[in-house]
Amino acid sequence: MSSIKKTLAFSLGTFFSRITGLVRDIILAKTFGASSTLDAYYVSIVFPFFLRRTFAEGAMSSAFMAIYKKLKNKEEKAQFTSAVLTSLGLVTLLIVFLSEVFPYFMASIFATGADEEVKSLAADLIRLTAPFITIVFVWAVFYSVHNASHRYFLPALTPMFSNVGVIVGCLFGDVRWAAAGFTIGGLAALLVLLPFGKFRYRPTFKGLGEFYRLFFGTFMTMAVSQVTTLIDVNVASFLDPGSLSLIQLSSRLYQLPLGIFGVAVSTVALSTLSESEGDFHENLKDFISKSLFLTLPSSIGLMALSERIISLLFGYGAFTHEDVKKSAQILFMYAIGLCFVSLFNLLSRAYHASKEVKTPFFATLLVSAVNISLDVILGFTMGASGIALATSVSYIAGFVFLTLRMKPSFDKKIFKISLASAVMGTVILLLRGSFKGNLGTIFLVLIGVFVYVLFSKLLKIEELEEILRRGSH
């Protein structure tokens, strides 16, 4: 299976998952608006998402894949999988226990500036979402097993179950049901990936030396990067009520193309580069082009249509016109750094694939230092949009750092991708005033896609040709 076919399989699964996530956010915004109630919900899922990112999309998958793919037979793979489940499973169970016993303390860590009402509600919700921590860890292990066997579609699809759980919970009109649905949906996602009848769990701690060496290096990198998320949440908790909700809703939109395209390319790159020998740098150059081909036009499109897109998706029910304007400003700032986040993640995965974890760790330290500093400066001067801008600037700095260290070769086709994206953005801006309302927004998006595909075809950008060729098979 070629890298573009793997990327498309992962992207398709992720697309369905992210679309259900978008529906989830629309329903959350419509039901609760940018309110203290929704703020409390987001506080309750901060830590489970932190662990999902470090395990499923970071330390666990990187360390697990690097070793699992080198093992020769099923017995070795089964023993290694059991050892990881045993050792880290006990750690997650302890975390769940502490979260259930001290939920108010957890809420206070993640939302220092929130009022007592928000913290108390968040504490109640944490008791419902905490079990997700162990669930998502076990899910992440089997997610990695599937990816190691080049099965990308189903694992990428499974996060949709948690989204569906939240959607169903919202139908009851109580945020507690939404939190419960979050955890129940996560359990459903795990059950789908479990290899019933093909894997027998045997408690063991054997053979984890190299895994932990890779895991802790990568985990520290990911943990440092996620500290910025906690700082984002804390700074937002000192701002106007609903600011955290606006940031979360806007960031989910910016993460939509990042998740469908950026994470897809990075995930496939980790698997491919882990097996690379002399063609490592050539493969990396190819993945850089693929990443930019998909994320650069997404970035420009989100900036050009930020308010129109927010209004189309969230401008209903309890979500006010003022909420729309504030969210659009936040989305614009996030979109500035979208392609740089994708490239930073890709270059970090390239280091992990070669079992070198120090450089991405220092790069993440830089990103975190810049982000935290700018969070405080811009967050308290610009408001919620300043927090988003801080994220973009910090990842630009991290990308520059990794580029200077790794010195990857960039394909000349990047100029063509930039030109096609610029033409697309210009056309959207010129036509924006001629297409009114939500239907007009949909037409503008379709026109943008058409223009980008057309100019990619005229400029003979290979990524488009490969996608069209694979899509026809």
UniProtKB/Swiss-Prot annotation:
Q: Name one GO molecular function term.
A: lipid-linked peptidoglycan transporter activity
GO BP annotations of the record are: cell wall organization; lipid translocation; lipid-linked peptidoglycan transport; peptidoglycan biosynthetic process; regulation of cell shape
This one is known as: Probable lipid II flippase MurJ
What keyword terms does UniProt attach to this protein? Answer: Cell inner membrane, Cell membrane, Cell shape, Cell wall biogenesis/degradation, Membrane, Peptidoglycan synthesis, Transmembrane, Transmembrane helix, Transport
Bilayer-crossing residues are 31-51, 90-110, 125-145, 153-173, 177-197, 215-235, 253-273, 300-320, 327-347, 360-380, 382-402, 414-434, 439-459
Q: How does it sit in the membrane?
A: Multi-pass membrane protein
**Native organism:** Thermotoga maritima (strain ATCC 43589 / DSM 3109 / JCM 10099 / NBRC 100826 / MSB8)
> Which pathway does the UniProt entry assign to this protein?
Cell wall biogenesis; peptidoglycan biosynthesis
Q: Name a single GO cellular component.
A: plasma membrane
Q: Where in the cell is it found?
A: Cell inner membrane
